[in-house]
């Protein structure tokens, strides 16, 4: 693996590992799957193929961020609408 690509791959791994802390199934589950995915591709030496894999990893980062934002939005929306609904119905 070429030096610039090596640093990209390491940074991608670190970013994914950091994002995995909030994964719904748990950080351990995410970390194991992440390690397995990286180990599966450890023998890839073609720079073009490595770049494709890095791009795919960056796509996964964007998808995880979208998942987390959506989850936080839903939780916040649920809190506000539960309060509003309970005050309208005088439940509590």
From Swiss-Prot:
Acts as a regulator of the electron transfer flavoprotein by promoting the removal of flavin from the ETF holoenzyme (composed of etfa and etfb). InterPro entries: Complex1_LYR_dom, Complex1_LYR_ETFRF1_LYRM5, ETFRF1. Keywords: Mitochondrion. Belongs to the complex I LYR family. One of its GO terms (cellular component) is mitochondrion. Its main location: mitochondrion. It comes from the Eukaryota. This is Electron transfer flavoprotein regulatory factor 1. The gene is etfrf1. It comes from Salmo salar (Atlantic salmon). It is found in: Mitochondrion. One of its GO terms (biological process) is respiratory electron transport chain. CDD domains: Complex1_LYR_ETFRF1_LYRM5.
